[in-house]
Amino acid sequence: MILIKNGRVMDPKSQRDQVADVLIDGKQIVKIASAIECQEAQVIDASGLIVAPGLVDIHVHFREPGQTHKEDIHTGALAAAAGGVTTVVMMANTNPVISDVETLQEVLASAAKEKIHIYTNASVTQAFNGKDVTDFKALLEAGAVSFSDDGIPLESSKVLKEAFDLANANQTFISLHEEDPQLNGVLGFNEGIAEEHFHFCGATGVAEYSMIARDVMIAYDRQAHVHIQHLSKAESVQVVAFAQQLGAKVTAEVSPQHFSTTEDLLLIAGTSAKMNPPLRTQRDRLAVIEGLKSGVITVIATDHAPHHKDEKTVDDMTKAPSGMTGLETSLSLGLTHLVEPGHLTLMSLLEKMTLNPALLYGFDAGYLAENGPADLVIFADKQERLITENFASKASNSPFIGNKLKGVVKYTIADGEVVYPN
């Protein structure tokens, strides 16, 4: 048993926000009240700290199988725990791609060994070929939670329509990476900074928002649910808002990096700040924040994309892979760039990092209640920390190294067990 004493208990589902004690027995919260006494329990003094549901991150790359020099499921789970994350959804762009039941079962067997809750998407198309839709029914029955070709945009409208119909038939949804290759230049560099400083055509805004426009309208026609991944453009927020007003089943996420900083960071942090979609302009950054405030964007998800140091340490930045390690900085970026400036309340931030992503997938997570799951994060919301290369992840490809950010995770509890510090 674990007894958490005197913390500020915050639950986005019930809107509870009060200093209280939380008693955990096994994998459940058994009591939330003031002044709980339990002699046999391990006591955690949470005075002055926030006690919240464990974070739910629905967009991570754990690189297993096939790319475990970057990350593996075990180190990914450690990184999640260090960041206060107790539930994750992995993407399917492994090697081999999670397109068949056999590969899916191998990945889930590895995930089951970890102490946090690890789910995975399967791919929409076979090995990301963009042509042949996978067996949704068989993959769902084998444990996939949804479908995404994340990392590779789905170019064929015909295939997308087929996938939406299949998703509907199986009561699921599709998540999409929106960057039309035919309208894009060099990935990872926003078009403005690409032209001005690097003198080539970069990743354009129209490549993102035009593809979103196509996809939300096909989803509208098919009455299918589409989830837009890591949108980054002001116009993308407007397109999603329009589709939602029309009655389309559209949800959207934003990554912390896109509400925290801009393309200029490429000139300072180099390849660590190269990602898809790229860091954009201040106008775009403020627009995605407005999307979070208005409720157009309901989910914050990291797109945790670890890479080996040697892969990122190259003379030609265009040759470096895109992506950044994100699980261990996401809460701090939210506190620093959303809560501290007054864009979101702490409760609203927690809602977008816990309850909303859990509801999207139907997970029993993202809330604190008696008889509910004992998945919690305990953190100091005002305390500053210096971001260093000392990550639990195998990777340290973060453009935020050297930054002072708000928020220090003190304890992460998953299934009633303290998993950080471990």
Swiss-Prot record:
The Gene Ontology terms for molecular function here are:
allantoinase activity; dihydroorotase activity; zinc ion binding
Q: Which reaction does it catalyse?
A: (S)-dihydroorotate + H2O = N-carbamoyl-L-aspartate + H(+)
Q: Where does Zn(2+) 1 bind?
A: H59, H61, D150, D303
Q: What does the entry list as the binding residues for Zn(2+) 2?
A: D150, H177, H230
Instruction: Identify the stretch annotated as signal peptide in this record.
Output: none
Q: Which GO terms describe its biological process?
A: 'de novo' UMP biosynthetic process; purine nucleobase catabolic process
* Cofactor(s) listed: Zn(2+)
Q: Catalytic center at which residues?
A: D303
Purpose:
Catalyzes the reversible cyclization of carbamoyl aspartate to dihydroorotate.
Q: Which HAMAP family does the UniProt record give?
A: PyrC_classI_B
Task: From the Swiss-Prot or TrEMBL record, give the protein name.
Answer: Dihydroorotase
Q: Its encoding gene is what?
A: pyrC
